[in-house]
Amino acid sequence: MDYFTLFGLPARYQLDTQALSLRFQDLQRQYHPDKFASGSQAEQLAAVQQSATINQAWQTLRHPLMRAEYLLSLHGFDLASEQHTVRDTAFLMEQLELREELDEIEQAKDEARLESFIKRVKKMFDTRHQLMVEQLDNETWDAAADTVRKLRFLDKLRSSAEQLEEKLLDFLISGS
């Protein structure tokens, strides 16, 4: 049973997140291992396994990029374990340049430049994310898979920039 079916939701990217949360809570109550404490060992094991599946499904469906990857996996794209990556050389060059810029910002400890960088990367991510949503809605799976691969790069870059932001904040607070 796929995660969408488990939660009684249509297999599409855009979800009713409130319905997802409510269904998660219902499933947690229904299959909580403590409810099966007096059951047979097989029932206890089944409850633990079902609970683990519910938690994994919840983590996957509530995170937008993971949900997109999962939806694509249902259509034959195993992005989590695939070997090939983005083939768009212009995009890859842009990523290298952005990484170099982030390194320069770190060396200079330039908080204002970092703030501007983070905003720029967020805008790039949001633009590609909107494109991905349209591609998934239109069931253009190949294009959506390519966009998800690019979003992974941007997500990692954004995460690195936010970690640097925390590091610079700690540096400024400690004064060293």
Curated annotation (Swiss-Prot):
HAMAP family: HscB (MF_00682). Signal peptide: none annotated. The keyword Signal does not apply. It comes from the Bacteria. This is Co-chaperone protein HscB. Belongs to the HscB family. Gene3D superfamilies: DnaJ domain, HscB, C-terminal domain. The keyword GTP-binding does not apply. Residues 2-74 form the J domain. Co-chaperone involved in the maturation of iron-sulfur cluster-containing proteins. Seems to help targeting proteins to be folded toward HscA. It comes from Escherichia coli O7:K1 (strain IAI39 / ExPEC). GO terms for biological process: [2Fe-2S] cluster assembly; protein complex oligomerization; protein folding. PANTHER family: IRON-SULFUR CLUSTER CO-CHAPERONE PROTEIN HSCB. Interacts with HscA and stimulates its ATPase activity. Interacts with IscU. Pfam families: HSCB_C.
